[in-house]
């Protein structure tokens, strides 16, 4: 059999383990076959090793079918066995192998609650994450930081997550402030630092230190306003956005005295970011302003902002933006968000959103809750619904009470099959197409009449 074809042949059984040193010289598949191999090289890792852990580096392998995956495709023991193999692979010599292992563990933890399993191995995982953050390059650092966020979400507040933050915090801070590091890695580390601090820290000094670190990053965008009326985006803009959003998240758990102090410092400077030529920066600045106004009015119902007229004019312009030089998708996204921001600033109103997960519903009725939900949704992806059902920490954050216990039979009756989803989506698509066709016909008739 040709060499390349042999490598593409799928392995039978579960994933095998791999590592460095003596462990790297022998690999075994779950089918029971053993063979001698040489230590991994970066070139081999992308082909041979990925065949062992590709199922765990693909988000869809854990997240697509939700919490019922194990009932249908394996047992808890199978998953834990495979995760042990992935944890071993985080020590591999190949950077690609380590990255794939980190991503695989992250995807598993994002789609399942594995508290007991993680609790026993938290120090091993923390050491692996620290090593990958220190010695890895851009993609590996991003994967390690993303795993650190999910690890803290699994552990929840307590001594264990405090130990994780104590170990990883200085490393994350160093990467965030390192101008020579990859922008993508710094961006993910900024989000991770904010989330881990939100979950784990009980030390007010540490909270203020994290706020200051993030503040030092995004406030660099303020400096450009002196040179021009429009803030031009730079490669660092994405980092500034992540730092601003993480800073805003942490502000929601600060004492009122610190919130008041930060309000006085930033409420007059943040509007300058609304003139950025990056749509994501404009949206992040607008949502942060709305949240700051909400916090300010929570402290003082008669909160007064001197430049209210100028601010509302700017928000109204963004809510009705018709600039032909901007992409249609960006304009549509921006107008939708800034309509809500304008209502929040002018009328103190928030359009309530409903999030459904299983038999439960959660109402997002304020900017603080929206910022919190959006942050964890970004990290957990499609696993957010499962964690809202099962993760006690998230249920406490969103005041959902203890997890609702449902037996397997009840869950099965509630689950919609893929075929039923397909039929529903097809009918909705057909109805939407007909409605839009009628609108297009009317516009065409009007054009011909005139």
From Swiss-Prot:
Disordered, as annotated region: 1-46
Keywords: Developmental protein, Differentiation
Source organism, top-level taxon: Eukaryota
InterPro entries registered for this protein in UniProt: ARM-like, ARM-type_fold, IFRD, Interferon-rel_develop_reg_C, Interferon-rel_develop_reg_N
Biased composition (Low complexity): 22-32
Chain segments annotated as coiled-coil in the UniProt record: none
One biological process term in Gene Ontology: cell differentiation
Membrane spanning stretches: none
Residue stretches of biased makeup (Basic residues): 1-10
Function noted in UniProt: Could play a role in regulating gene activity in the proliferative and/or differentiative pathways induced by NGF. May be an autocrine factor that attenuates or amplifies the initial ligand-induced signal.
Family membership: Belongs to the IFRD family.
Subunit description: Interacts with PSIP1/LEDGF.
PANTHER family linked to this entry: INTERFERON-RELATED DEVELOPMENTAL REGULATOR (PTHR12354), INTERFERON-RELATED DEVELOPMENTAL REGULATOR 1 (PTHR12354:SF6)
Protein name: Interferon-related developmental regulator 1
Originating organism: Sus scrofa (Pig)
Gene: IFRD1
